[in-house]
């Protein structure tokens, strides 16, 4: 995802009574494709992020910047799968129609090292509570329809720019990355192919209710200070 599922999260998949058990291996997370709900930056912004990350990676790590078309902020992880779970996806698509939420102003003004593999990511130093609220709304929509998602965790919205780079210098942010997020989508990330397949995109509506002002914004991965 951006926040990609951790090994523990992705290996835990709910098998719901009355539903066909979706074919999923309970082995290492890295051997499975991932299904998640995310928002992606506009193409021009994603290109700018990629270019800056690629420049930063040069001479610092052998890892390459994450491709433009794959940059995202994960909202909710669904699980890891051996094959595309079409039946589940149909149910998820129906649930996503229930989500009525406003567009979100996104600003990424800091970099940090996230996750056990020390991947480089962009985030907001003051938090992005509206994104946390949107993620909570999506989870509620899934629960109402008895659909699975990864165990609920606190959320630090972020865009991972270089995966598995180790403890490299943080990327300086001279001009914050800002955009208005107008939709979210259901994404299947194909393992080993560096490819996302979208299974639907849902608009955020300007006339929807405001997000709560007290959404908790807790660090999930305890990023280092930029």
Task: Show the residue positions of the predicted features.
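Histidine-dependent nucleotide/RNA phosphoesterase domain, centered on the 2H-phosphoesterase fold
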Residues: 1-226
């Amino acid at each position: 995802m951006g926040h990609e599922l951790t090994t523990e999260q992705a290996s835990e998949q709910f098998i719901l009574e009355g539903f066909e058990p979706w074919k999923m291996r309970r082995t290492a997370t890295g051997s499975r494709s991932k299904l998640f709900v995310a928002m992606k930056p506009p193409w021009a912004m994603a290109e700018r992020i990629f270019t800056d990350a690629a420049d930063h990676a040069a001479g610092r790590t052998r890892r390459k910047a994450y491709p433009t078309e794959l940059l995202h902020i994960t909202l909710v992880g669904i699980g890891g799968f051996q094959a595309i779970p079409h039946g589940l996806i149909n149910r998820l698509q129906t649930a996503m129609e229930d989500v009525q939420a406003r567009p979100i102003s996104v600003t990424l003004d800091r970099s940090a090292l996230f996750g056990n593999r020390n991947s480089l990511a962009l985030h907001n130093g003051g938090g992005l509570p509206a994104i946390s609220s949107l993620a909570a709304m999506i989870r509620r929509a899934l629960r109402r329809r008895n659909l699975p998602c990864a165990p609920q965790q606190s959320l630090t919205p972020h865009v991972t720019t270089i995966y598995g780079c180790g403890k490299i210098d943080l990327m300086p942010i001279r001009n914050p990355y800002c955009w208005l997020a107008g939709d979210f989508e259901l994404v299947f990330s194909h393992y080993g192919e560096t490819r996302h397949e979208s299974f639907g995109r849902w608009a955020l509506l300007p006339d929807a209710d405001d997000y709560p002002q007290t959404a908790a914004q807790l660090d999930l991965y305890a990023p280092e200070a930029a």
